Amino acid sequence: MAEEEDYMSDSFINVQEDIRPGLPMLRQIREARRKEEKRQEANLKNRQKSIKEEEQERRDMGLKNALGCENKGFALLQKMGYKSGQALGKSGDGIVEPIPLNVKTGKSGIGHETLLKRKAEEKLESYRRKIHMKSQAEERAAEQFRIRLKNKQDEMKLEGDLRRSQRACQQLDTQKNIQVPREAWYWLRPEEETEEETEEEKEQDEDEYKSEDLSVLEKLQILTSYLREEHLYCIWCGTAYEDKEDLSSNCPGPTSADHD
């Protein structure tokens, strides 16, 4: 029978645990140390000023300090009567502070920045001109559209007034037993010819319509005058008056504008 192990013996009690870090722990430590070194290096760089910054600071410091008597040029000015802080010029109204020094640090040639600025201004001015011209063109197009629309509306109104005059003329002529209009266009032309109409009559009507050279406005003016003279009627008033005196007294005039 095998001997049982004694868990209270020294072989178990005095065993020391192996607490050495494994591979993952070593990686974490190295990564943390590397980050700390980078942080310290970045802080050091931030604390150190560049050569250009140091030159700029020394230059600004020198320009801020006034020249002392030890300066030969300033001593010569004092002998000529100049006092520290006095304005330049005979009348004493010149500048007091020295002209600021603008040090060029870029690699571009002299006048390059001025050229770029002028080109940018020219480009901006060209853009503004294009916008202005485009705006003017849009305004002209809108105005022309309004004019065309108004002309179209005016034309449609004239055509409507002419049809009303032709319809009224046909009714009033018929009431006076006038069988044939004074002019063919005084009456509304039927949209469809009757079957009894001969081919000769059709050709005659077509010739009459083709030979018309009067505009809608001219036809309306002529027909309006006929209705007023022959029937004492005004299409805009919609009234047949008793006599010429009644017509002239109560009708505003022979045009549509007179009735607005």
Swiss-Prot record:
The keyword Coiled coil applies. It is found in: Chromosome, Centromere, Kinetochore. One of its GO terms (molecular function) is nucleic acid binding. SMART domains: DUF4187, G_patch. Residues 69-115 form the G-patch domain. Its main location: nucleus. PROSITE patterns: G_PATCH. GO terms for cellular component: kinetochore. Disulfide bonds: none annotated. The keyword Coiled coil applies. This is G patch domain-containing protein 11. It comes from Bos taurus.
